[in-house]
Amino acid sequence: MPTVLRWGPYRAFFYSNEGAEPAHIHVRSGHFEAKFWLHDLSVAVNAGFPAHEIGDIIRHLKLNREALLRAWKEHFGS
């Protein structure tokens, strides 16, 4: 599971077996994890993050969206 980005307590990464799904990123901090679709940065799954923290994460992902999409394409080849 390659890590693409780290900031503060967060780690953004891919699961290598999820390349058949649309482009997305997982973010983990402690025991919390969420999955975000990269095309619109919507939340696909949230396991534990409070709403205000999800908003902060989305803002950070938005700033790095192009790099995240590039990393997805490099890793999965699509």
Where are these regions (language model features)?
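Glycine-rich, flexible loop/turn motifs
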Residues: M1, V45, W72
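Alpha-helical interaction segments
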Residues: V4, H26, K62-E66
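A short, structured beta-strand/loop element
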Residues: Y15-P50
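Short, charged/polar N-terminal "headpieces" of proteins
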Residues: M1-E21
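C-terminal structural segments of small proteins and small subunits
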Residues: P50-S78
